[in-house]
Amino acid sequence: MNGLLIGRFQPFHSGHLDAVLFALSRVENLWIGVGSSNKHNEKRNPFTADERREMIVSSIKPSIIDRTSIFNIPDVDDHEKWTFEIDQIVPKYDIVFTNDEFTKTLFGKRGIDVITVTLKEREKFSGTNIRQLITDDKNWHDLVPKGTQSVLEKINADQRLKNL
């Protein structure tokens, strides 16, 4: 059975890693969709799709990474069309994992099974919070996996975020 998990991953944090592990405990293969892949260098979307892909790959244990595939999911103007666009990008999936009510509704309307992913400490483990902590030179390192931390340091995320 194949599952789909979509997120912006700006950046990929420990809450996202927990969601990936949760999904992998329920499906054989997990398609990870990097949402808003066509956006970067914006305050809300500062990192490129390739940078986010690198964060994900470097954060997932090698023993399970082969059960995942990562796909770029660009934003489209029509929400209803969005789920069908995804079908053109990723292989067949049986279940969608999400914590987003709108995503649940869109896929649910199509009769696709949707499983709610409960994100731990949502306010603390949010991309918005982590980006702000990085910008303010406050401790953010314990909120992201080591792989993400390495990527953020390599690309000088602190300087990028301060300049947006």
Each language-model region and where it sits:
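Nucleotidyltransferase catalytic core that binds NTPs
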Residues: M1-L164
